Amino acid sequence: MQDDTSSEQNPTHCSAINSSVPLVQGALPTLTLSGKIRVTVTFFLFLVSTTLNASFLLKLQKWTQKKEKGKKLSRMKVLLKHLTLANLLETLIVMPLDGMWNITVQWYAGELLCKILSYLKLFSMYAPAFMMVVISLDRSMAITRPLPVQSNRKLEQSMTGLAWGLSSVLAGPQLYIFKMIHLENGPGQTEVFSQCVTHCSFPQWWHQAFYNFFTFICLFIIPLLIMLICNAKIIFTLTQVLQQDSNKLQLNQSKNNIPRARLRTLKMTVAFAASFIVCWTPYYVLGLWYWFDPGMLHRMSEPVNHFFFLFAFLNPCFDPLIYGYFSL
């Protein structure tokens, strides 16, 4: 979801972007009590997520060192490593940025960092969502269409590379649409407020609506649908297999039983999807509501607003707990 100072595009104001515009009607935003609570919770979750994800990366590194010479980590652990890196990136960029921005209320870092950090913020949100898609696809194919080990390795590398690449490309527009605006009391008077926003970056209001909706589809709807379809296929296939005669039970070269390790990773994949839904749904429901009814911010309690946004920060905290429990 993108920030903006107004729901309308004023041509006079738009011509003054990057210089200054008259102060809009109404009080400027300040750090309220609920805002302070949000900042406190944000930095607490930042410490939790950083500790958990960094610890899991360290554990994977030690696991790699214990491997016999010439042997590599399993495909699943490689995918978990990519997901952990993506979660760590989101933690180190999005959470401190959100916390500091809520403290300062306005933007003091200049236009260059406004663009760069806005790009990195969206990039670090795309990456973990796409990595969870890769894991869901990988587990689904491992159950329904098992391939030789070498083919699986190549497919895994292609999918993870595509996930990182798409994250980078889809976040690209942030470098263009985010700008600094400076508000002042009147012409020639002292500047009183600066902000990093998308104000006036779109010729028509529906252009911004389209961009926001496109981002919502790519960040939430598409990953969610893919994960749901993959998990449904996994559950359906396992149900069929478990209903067969135990003497004929065979899954991907395993005899007479489903390997426990594979069952663990399948349960983990389902848990990832559940975590994604629980953590991100409130965030995007609030975003969609705002896009169609900007006035809702004035009707909704500020603490409730902050609470919904904080839900999204739980996802990188839950993920290492999930894969730590199921994989090692």
Curated annotation (Swiss-Prot):
Disulfide bonds join C114-C196. The keyword Lipid metabolism does not apply. Its main location: membrane. Residues 60-84, 137-160, 230-271, 328 are cytoplasmic. Glycans are attached at N18. Keywords: Cell membrane, Disulfide bond, G-protein coupled receptor, Glycoprotein, Membrane, Receptor, Transducer, Transmembrane, Transmembrane helix. One of its GO terms (molecular function) is peptide binding. Residues 1-38, 106-115, 182-208, 293-306 are extracellular. The keyword Glycoprotein applies. It comes from the Eukaryota. GO terms for cellular component: plasma membrane. Pfam families: 7tm_1. It is found in: Cell membrane. The chain crosses the membrane at residues 39-59, 85-105, 116-136, 161-181, 209-229, 272-292, 307-327. It is a multi-pass membrane protein. Belongs to the G-protein coupled receptor 1 family. Receptor for gonadotropin releasing hormone (GnRH) that mediates the action of GnRH to stimulate the secretion of the gonadotropic hormones luteinizing hormone (LH) and follicle-stimulating hormone (FSH). This receptor mediates its action by association with G-proteins that activate a phosphatidylinositol-calcium second messenger system. This is Gonadotropin-releasing hormone receptor. It comes from Cavia porcellus. The gene is GNRHR.
